[in-house]
Amino acid sequence: MPSANASRKGQEKPREIVDAAEDYAKERYGVSSMIQSQEKPDRVLVRVKDLTVQKADEVVWVRARVHTSRAKGKQCFLVLRQQQFNVQALVAVGDHASKQMVKFAANINKESIIDVEGIVRKVNQKIGSCTQQDVELHVQKIYVISLAEPRLPLQLDDAIRPEVEGEEDGRATVNQDTRLDNRIIDLRTSTSQAIFHLQSGICHLFRETLINKGFVEIQTPKIISAASEGGANVFTVSYFKSNAYLAQSPQLYKQMCICADFEKVFCIGPVFRAEDSNTHRHLTEFVGLDIEMAFNYHYHEVVEEIADTLVQIFKGLQERFQTEIQTVNKQFPCEPFKFLEPTLRLEYCEALAMLREAGVEMDDEEDLSTPNEKLLGRLVKEKYDTDFYVLDKYPLAVRPFYTMPDPRNPKQSNSYDMFMRGEEILSGAQRIHDPQLLTERALHHGIDLEKIKAYIDSFRFGAPPHAGGGIGLERVTMLFLGLHNVRQTSMFPRDPKRLTP
C-alpha cells in the first residue's frame, strides 16, 4: 500500500500538468535566448524617463533592471530602473497574465535586465518611491534578457540611503570601501548616475565655452622623457631600454603650443601625481581641465577668461542639470552653489588680513594650510555671499620656479588660485617667458638645469607673454555638489592605497 506522501506526490503531478495546461500566458514570459545579434526586430524601446502622462494608454516596450519586486496575492509589483529613473510595473492575473507569469515575475533576481511590454496607465495617487510618479506600467509580456546572480555584494537601496537616516533608524548604509570594491554595482545607483552625468556636463560646458571663446583643443603626451616641471612626485615606467615618466601636468606642452602661435589652448586628459596623500581631495590619477593663453598686457586678462569659463560652467549646470543636482541632494543635502558676476578677486594680503582678524597667526610669505583655506572660504561666504572666488598675488616663495615675479613687489608673484566652497580647484600663474629669467629662477630653486633644458629652450625663439592654470575635474564636481570625498566623483579612483578595480 503506498504511503500518504507517495499518494500526495501522485496527486501533485497531475496538478502540475493541469497548471501547465492552464498557463495560457506561457508565450508571454520567460528567459530570452542570448542576444548575439541574430536579428534586429522592428521594436522601439521607450526610455523610462519618457514614461509620462502624455503616454497614458499607449502600449510600449521598455528595457530596464529589476530594482525591487513585491508579490501580493495574484499580482506582483516591480520597480524598473534605468539609470537614475524608475517606474512601477504591475503584473496581475488577468487576460494577459497567468498566475504562473506573476510567480515568474516575482522570482526574477534583483538587478536582472528585462524587456517588458505594457500599457502606460495614469495613477490616481502619486507613486512617491519612483521618479515617474504619475504613471505605472501594466505588464503584458516580460522576458529576462540578462539574469543577475541572486546574491548581490551590496543592496542599492542601502547604497542610496542618506547616512543620517541610517543612523537615526538603524537601517544599513554602505561604507566607502565596500562601494569602491564593488564599483560596478555602486555606479548603478541613482546618485552615482547623477554625479557622472553632471560630470560629463562639466567637460561638455568647458569645451563648449572655450571653443566659443576661440580656444583650440590640443592633446599632449602623457609619457615623457623627464620629470615635468622638474618635480619629484612622478611615476616612473619602463620604456623599452630606458625609463620614462607619467606626466604630472600638460603645462610644458601647453606653453610650447603658445610659443608655436596657437594663442589660446585647452586640453582635457589624465594627470598623474605620485604623492602619498591619503586625504579627501587627493588622487594619484585625475582628469585635468587645462588652459593656457597668450595675453596682451596683463595676466588678469587670462584670470578673467578662466573665471568667466568657470562661471559659464556653473550657470550651465544649474540650467541643464537640475534633475541630477536634486537626485544627489536627496542623499547628500547641500546648499545651492553660489557665485558672483564678475567673479570676486581678492589679493593674498587681503585674505591674510581676514584670517588674522579671525585669530589665525600667519607670516606674510606663508602658504595657506587646508584648514585655513576652509576658514577663509567661510569668511568670504559670510562677507561676500559667494562660494567661488579668486585669490591673487601669492607670495613668490611658495610658488614654482616658472612663476613670474610681481615687478612692483619682489616678494609677490603674478599667480592665483581659484576656490570653491573654501577648497582650491585651480592653481595658475603668469609663466616666465624669458629664458634668462627662467634660468635664474630655476637656479634659485636649486633645480638641475640639465633636467629642464628642453623646457627652457622652448622660449629661446620668441615667446609671447602668457598665463594659464589647471583644474581638477573630480574636485570641481565634488565641490559643486557639496560632497565630502573626491572618490565619490572619480569613476574608478586611484589613490596610494587603491589600484583596483
Swiss-Prot record:
SUPFAM superfamilies: Class II aaRS and biotin synthetases, Nucleic acid-binding proteins. PROSITE patterns: AA_TRNA_LIGASE_II (PS50862). The modification N6-acetyllysine is found at residues 74, 374. L-aspartate binds at residues 229, 273, 427, 431. It catalyses: tRNA(Asp) + L-aspartate + ATP = L-aspartyl-tRNA(Asp) + AMP + diphosphate. Residues 251-254 are annotated as: Aspartate. Its EC number is 6.1.1.12. One of its GO terms (cellular component) is aminoacyl-tRNA synthetase multienzyme complex. ATP binds at residues 273-275, 281-283, 424, 472-475. Belongs to the class-II aminoacyl-tRNA synthetase family. Type 2 subfamily. GO terms for biological process: aspartyl-tRNA aminoacylation. Homodimer. Part of a multisubunit complex that groups tRNA ligases for Arg (RARS1), Asp (DARS1), Gln (QARS1), Ile (IARS1), Leu (LARS1), Lys (KARS1), Met (MARS1) the bifunctional ligase for Glu and Pro (EPRS1) and the auxiliary subunits AIMP1/p43, AIMP2/p38 and EEF1E1/p18. Keywords: Acetylation, Aminoacyl-tRNA synthetase, ATP-binding, Cytoplasm, Ligase, Nucleotide-binding, Phosphoprotein, Protein biosynthesis. Its main location: cytoplasm. This is Aspartate--tRNA ligase, cytoplasmic. The modification Phosphoserine is found at residue 249. Coiled coil: none annotated. GO terms for molecular function: aspartate-tRNA ligase activity; ATP binding; RNA binding. Catalyzes the specific attachment of an amino acid to its cognate tRNA in a 2 step reaction: the amino acid (AA) is first activated by ATP to form AA-AMP and then transferred to the acceptor end of the tRNA. InterPro entries: Aa-tRNA-synt_II, aa-tRNA-synth_II, aa-tRNA-synth_II/BPL/LPL, Asp-tRNA_synthase_2, Asp/Asn-tRNA-synth_IIb, NA-bd_OB-fold, NA-bd_OB_tRNA. It is found in: Cytoplasm. The lineage of its organism: Eukaryota, Metazoa, Chordata, Craniata, Vertebrata. Pfam families: tRNA-synt_2, tRNA_anti-codon. The modification Phosphothreonine is found at residue 52.
